């Protein structure tokens, strides 16, 4: 099984805070049957403003983690990727760090309380460049909680939808859980 959206590499963003925390996360993942993880460090997000989020730094963190994993006999493969914060510049930042699947996909996160109207054109422009947008955890966005038709618009525009497993369990709040369940019921998501 592949964990598609994870912040496992230490000290890069608001995910793992230490090597020990990353190893604990990996032990849990292994117990759950996960064999591969796509690390999706935040990119151009206000949470990481001013931090060095580069392919080199991510690779260094992964190698450090691999060394420690080998000592514990953990053999989960970690792929490098990002969760790109929506700004109108998405087409201009297509590169190996901001995309995955050989440049074919970009995981995109919006503000929890606002989905800009301009995003429709930006997502279309990404598609025209051969990059399929994957909308990260839409069930957590207030505009989607209030109007699920936004998910249909994204799907009709060729986007894919990724839900957060924590939303389905209720650990991210009741509104996210209700919206996630509705998205699943309507068969609108491709990744959990």
Predicted segments, located by residue:
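An N-terminally biased module of ancient metal coordination in phosphate/nucleic-acid-related enzymes
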Residues: 1-74
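Metallo-beta-lactamase
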Residues: 7-16, 148-155, 163-166
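Extended substrate/RNA-proximal surfaces in nucleic-acid metabolism proteins
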Residues: 48-162, 176
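Short acidic/histidine-rich active-site segments
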Residues: 189-192
